[in-house]
């Protein structure tokens, strides 16, 4: 089995390195890269507006990294008053490392639905909520917090940018390297991969590969696109992906 990892850098490269250490044949094929978000200049003032028991959310490690870089440039600190939340363990660790604050996150699965089930997010009417995220993505968290009575604002900390490839050339390369397992960690990247690979290679190679995804929502999308052999990892971090690939 040869494994194609589409997760962006640096996590994608780390996963490939760990797979190779375990004797697996693995390749990195990142589909997106990241650049600073347009709303970063407003971040420090948005953070300063948060009071005691208000809510601060980080939806990815990338949001934390770009936010920290911006605050460092402005010689500003993370606030101590709000309650901190993260989408999952890895993002929580990154946020704790830069802020020093206690971070609440879902212990089960790193998805919006599970985050929103936390007891601390049930009675939030009248609280301010600031969500650190990238461009695009799902609106479920913001919409749900608003429905529960919170005053929600966003800071686009980074932008996802598609990396451009010659689809036929890449399909030939990965088919020649006998790739039979593909790792995809977002719906956006799954759609991008499907669109990138020309129809002939899609039907004769890509859709015959086993697909490893990180949620049932992604698995459903994959089935709609034509995949049949789909495995869902028990979480979205590299440890979970590694377990699923053993």
Curated annotation (Swiss-Prot):
It catalyses: hydroxymethylbilane = uroporphyrinogen III + H2O. Pathway: Porphyrin-containing compound metabolism; protoporphyrin-IX biosynthesis; coproporphyrinogen-III from 5-aminolevulinate: step 3/4. One of its GO terms (molecular function) is uroporphyrinogen-III synthase activity. Disulfide bonds: none annotated. Pfam families: HEM4. It comes from the Bacteria. Its EC number is 4.2.1.75. InterPro entries: 4pyrrol_syn_uPrphyn_synt_sf, 4pyrrol_synth_uPrphyn_synth, UROS/Hem4. Keywords: Lyase, Porphyrin biosynthesis. It is an enzyme of class 4 (lyase). The keyword Transmembrane helix does not apply. GO terms for biological process: protoporphyrinogen IX biosynthetic process; uroporphyrinogen III biosynthetic process. Belongs to the uroporphyrinogen-III synthase family. NCBIfam families: PRK05928.1-1. Monomer. This is Uroporphyrinogen-III synthase.
């Amino acid at each position: 089995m040869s494994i194609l990892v589409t997760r962006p850098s640096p996590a994608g490269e780390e996963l490939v390195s760990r797979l190779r250490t375990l004797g697996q044949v693995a390749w990195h094929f990142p589909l997106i890269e990241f650049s600073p978000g347009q709303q970063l200049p407003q971040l420090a003032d948005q953070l300063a507006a948060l009071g005691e028991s208000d809510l601060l959310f980080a939806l990815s490690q990338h949001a934390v990294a770009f936010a920290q870089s911006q605050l460092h440039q402005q010689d500003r600190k993370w606030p101590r008053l709000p309650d901190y939340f993260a989408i999952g363990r890895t993002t929580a660790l990154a946020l704790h490392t830069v802020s020093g604050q206690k971070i609440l996150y879902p212990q089960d699965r790193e998805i919006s639905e599970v985050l929103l089930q936390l007891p601390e997010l049930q009675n939030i009417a009248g609280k301010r909520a600031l969500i650190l995220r990238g461009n695009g993505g799902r609106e479920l968290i913001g919409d749900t917090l608003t429905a529960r009575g919170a005053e929600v604002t966003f800071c686009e900390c980074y932008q996802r940018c598609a990396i451009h490839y010659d689809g036929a050339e890449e399909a030939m390369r990965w088919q020649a390297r006998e790739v039979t397992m593909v790792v995809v960690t977002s719906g956006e990247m799954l759609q991008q991969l499907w669109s990138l690979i020309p129809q002939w290679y899609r039907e004769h190679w890509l859709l015959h590969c086993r697909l490893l995804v990180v949620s049932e929502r992604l698995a459903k999308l994959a089935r709609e696109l034509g995949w049949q052999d789909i495995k869902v990892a028990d979480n979205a971090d590299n440890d979970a992906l590694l377990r699923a690939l053993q």
